[in-house]
């Protein structure tokens, strides 16, 4: 502690990082941010009834409130939040999944597998938070440590055995999970994303690696790594001297691996090999990369003491994840998938897989988000141009950027893009794609996945790709007889 003032004997009612959530007696942490700095809201925090404030900067002249300056407010926040909520993480088994792609599918599938044995498990991730007795929409892939500790308290009080977490690179860099010990931590893969935040790929990888090397405050009980990914293989080599390590993949040297894959638009069938035994699996998740996601979840379950080969029926029964290769059925004579793919690697995975299993053409609607990594935009366009026979580039979430500027970045210096149209209105682009699709074709609408809104500057409007597809197809069929 660098200094403190005021009376620190007051009883604290809650721990918050957003002044709008303050109730009388709150302990407010003023955290720096990319868009707003918590230090700018100190007066608001006091006016709303904060009893104490912790800052990372020297602050003077705060009336009638306890204040302290600390060197690392985020790490102090994580420790204070755990203490305030009575260390609920000690009553839970924690699993964390990090990586560019696959976090949502792996964590959701893992929860499904673990609950197959009758236990209740919580879930923290991009789509929803399942807290034991209730489920709420997600507001951040990995929330701030103050929220996380509160969610763990709800899970523990509801009798959950543990929690399955998606752990983002932002969360690791910002110490949101610092000091939480993960019984199992897994790495899926690493490809370009979030360079606008991290600066370069080495910094991005370093953020992910913090979950495994102790910089997060704790080493995981078991590290689970994808050895089909070169970064995962390197992490596995680094993790083995530190503690228990398991690997998965298609590689022959993986501890848990898949062979004899058969893929189509309905899913996958494959053999899982584990400790000298084999079991045939069927999954409704489409694509070889989803086989990797299944392997990751099975290996994490094995790290928790489950027999992964005994989970074949549970994998077959898994209904999938909203907006992750989610199939929309509205009577059309061709498959339509909604997917969250928003990097060039994810698009290549999805489109490349569909090219291999689709008898007709592969069609794609996609866009690039505003106020995010501009460098990946031409690479995303190149991926779609290489693999989709017809494509419509359109608005994703433009946010505060002009769509014209986003389109210019997407075109880059790629030259002519035959078979690709740039259509500003996303609904119109989806309509054109549906009109162009024929029996035998396959359409994937990429980028927004489970999202139900679209962001323009300071405006958020309702927009759900799945619902838009249904509305357009229903309008073309006309009124029911």
Which functions belong to the PLM regions below?
Residues 1-79, 83, 230, 254-259, ...:
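N-terminal leader/targeting and accessory segments in enzymes
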Residues 1-11, 21-27, 33, 37-40, ...:
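ATP-dependent carboxylate-amine ligase
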Residues 12, 25, 50, 64-65, ...:
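Short, well-ordered alpha-helix to beta-strand connector turns
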Residues 76-227, 233-243, 295, 301-304, ...:
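Phosphate-binding loop of NTP-binding sites
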Residues 55-64, 158, 173, 181-336, ...:
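Acidic, Mg2+-coordinating active-site environments of NTP-dependent enzymes
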Residues 60-62, 128-131, 171-173, 230-234, ...:
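Short, active-site-adjacent cap segments at secondary-structure transitions
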Residues 51-57, 222-227, 365-366, 389-397:
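Short internal beta-strands
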Residues 5-15, 77-80, 143-146, 165-172, ...:
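Short gly/ser/thr-rich secondary-structure transition/capping motifs
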């Amino acid at each position: 502690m660098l200094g403190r003032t005021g009376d620190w004997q007051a009883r604290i009612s809650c721990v918050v990082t957003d002044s709008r959530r303050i109730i009388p007696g709150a302990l407010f942490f003023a955290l720096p941010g990319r868009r707003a700095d918590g230090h700018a809201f100190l007066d608001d925090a006091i006016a709303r009834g904060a009893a104490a404030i912790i800052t990372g900067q020297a602050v003077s002249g705060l009336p009638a409130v306890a204040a302290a300056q600390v060197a690392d407010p985020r790490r102090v926040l994580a420790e204070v939040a755990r203490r305030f909520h009575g260390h609920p993480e000690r009553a839970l088994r924690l699993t964390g999944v990090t990586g560019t792609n696959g976090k949502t599918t792996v964590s959701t599938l893992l929860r499904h597998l673990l609950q197959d044995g009758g236990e209740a498990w919580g879930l923290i991730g991009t789509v929803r938070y399942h807290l034991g007795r209730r489920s709420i929409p997600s507001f951040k892939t990995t929330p701030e440590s103050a929220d996380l500790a509160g969610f763990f308290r709800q899970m523990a009080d509801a009798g959950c055995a543990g929690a399955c977490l998606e752990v983002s690179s932002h969360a690791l860099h910002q110490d949101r999970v610092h000091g939480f010990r993960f019984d199992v931590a897994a790495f899926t893969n690493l490809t370009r994303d979030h360079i606008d935040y991290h600066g370069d790929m080495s910094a991005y990888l370093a953020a992910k690696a913090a979950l495994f090397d102790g910089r997060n405050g704790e080493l995981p009980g078991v590290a689970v790594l994808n050895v089909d990914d070169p970064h995962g293989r390197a992490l596995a080599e680094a993790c083995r001297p530190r503690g228990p390590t398991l690997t998965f993949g298609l590689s022959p040297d993986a501890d848990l691996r898949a062979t004899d894959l058969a893929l189509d638009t309905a899913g996958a069938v494959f053999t899982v090999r584990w400790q000298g035994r084999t079991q045939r699996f069927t999954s409704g998740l489409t694509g070889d990369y989803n086989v990797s996601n299944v392997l990751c979840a099975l290996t994490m379950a094995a790290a928790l003491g489950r027999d992964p080969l005994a989970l074949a029926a549970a994998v077959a029964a898994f209904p999938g994840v909203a907006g992750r290769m989610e199939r929309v059925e509205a009577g059309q004579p061709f498959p339509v998938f909604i997917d969250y793919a928003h990097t060039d690697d994810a698009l290549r995975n999805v489109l490349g897989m569909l090219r291999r299993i689709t008898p007709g053409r592969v069609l794609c609607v996609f866009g690039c988000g505003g106020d995010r990594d501009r460098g990946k935009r031409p690479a995303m366009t190149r991926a779609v141009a290489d693999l989709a026979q017809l494509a419509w580039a359109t608005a994703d979430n433009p946010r505060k950027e002009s769509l014209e500027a986003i389109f210019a970045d997407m075109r880059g210096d790629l030259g002519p893009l035959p078979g690709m149209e740039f259509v500003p209105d996303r609904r119109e682009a989806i309509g054109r794609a549906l009109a162009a699709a024929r029996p035998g074709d396959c359409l994937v609408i990429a980028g927004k996945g489970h999202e139900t809104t679209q962001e323009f500057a300071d405006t958020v409007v309702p927009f759900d790709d799945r619902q838009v597809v249904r509305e357009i197809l229903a309008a073309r069929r006309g009124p029911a007889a």
